Amino acid sequence: MKFAFFTNIISPHQMPLARALVELLGADEYRYVYTEAEEKGRADLGWGNEGEDWCLHGDENTAVLNEADVLMSGVRAPNLFEKRAKEGKTTFYCSERWFKPPIGFLRVFVPSYFKMARRIVKLLNENENFYYLPMGIHAARDMARLCGLMNGDWKCLFRAPKLDFERKPGGKVFSEGVKECGSVGVGECVGKMRMWGYFVQSSEFRVGSLELNHGIHRIHGRKECGHEGVKVLWVGRLLKIKRVDTIIKAVGECSKSKKITLDIYGVGPEEGKLKKIAAKYGDVVKFHPPVPINEVRKLMREHDVYVLSSNGYEGWGAVVSEALEEGMAVIGTYEAGSSATILPESNLFHAGDWRKLKELLEGDVERVGIGPWTAKSAAEFLTGLTRLTGLGNGY
């Protein structure tokens, strides 16, 4: 079975799945096609993997994308999708949410955007071999809203439907009993969706069967880390959408009644503002330079809690999976794709609500394992679902 993946960059959040597929299918049957070279700053931190023989630089006209028995694409390429549909070939289109703030749903009123979205919805409605893989429940709701609107349900101009879903890669999405947006076109649309995300490298230091390690876990210093108190970690670019100020305030206020510290690794335009906020709390918050990707996991093993504080701009947030792999307690926002999809509601707070985050840090947090959200599980789902397409002779 010839399988191709089409994306914009070579990402460390996509390569684990790529390698899992190569292991299952063989290198001769798999191609990873990317459109852009990685920017130098990210390349220096470990992004990029052009050395793999199955990685190709190209565009939507690259021959292997149409030759593949199965294509998974993170690029919106309706011309390619329609061509493959006419030839009866299986295509999975995956994306983060369609209507990120602040523009949000207003994007649908841009003529070119509306036309592109209508073509995608038409493929979902009319082609049995075209599927949508939403990167999180917010992306699924956005697509369901589009489907309802394109099928004449004008209520979808004002709200997105609430959906239920199976919490696993390839999990089904359900719209039964949903009243929002009526039912015109929504049920048919979600029947062609399967839950998706980014899948990270499995931890080499996972102890026992962490996948089964569920239950209430009071946040405290991990003895194996060799420190007292609670160490909170945040890693990334210091951007406004990341809402790192929320963590600083929550940890700072917590520090008045318990031993807790916050380590921030990264730089960005918000750095000066964040340091001013942190200065109010003495040495509770420490800032560090960015570190390469392969060192982030080591930091996670030295800390107790990871907080994903991003607002709705965060389409996914693969760091949630990385932290779970390393056995950390993880708290995230309702607005970010990964936390809303993977974490239990007891571990969630709304972006910017530092008081709720403080409450979570002071109380009990459900410590969960990565569960089925692994590259191996995702690869097995894809190959199992598409096995009937037949086997090719390689590229």
Place the predicted regions along the sequence by residue:
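A charged, aromatic-enriched C-terminal amphipathic alpha-helix characteristic of glycosyltransferases
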Residues: 362-395
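Nucleotide-activated donor-binding/catalytic signature segment of Leloir-type glycosyltransferases, i.e.
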Residues: 275-291
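Membrane-proximal helix-turn-helix segments that form the acceptor-binding/catalytic region
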Residues: 110-132, 141, 145, 177
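Conserved acidic donor-binding segment of nucleotide-sugar-dependent glycosyltransferases
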Residues: 344-355, 362-365
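Short alpha-helical donor nucleotide-sugar binding micro-motif in glycosyltransferases
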Residues: 290, 298-303
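Short alpha-helical segment that forms part of, or immediately flanks, the ligand-binding pocket
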Residues: 297, 320-325, 339-340
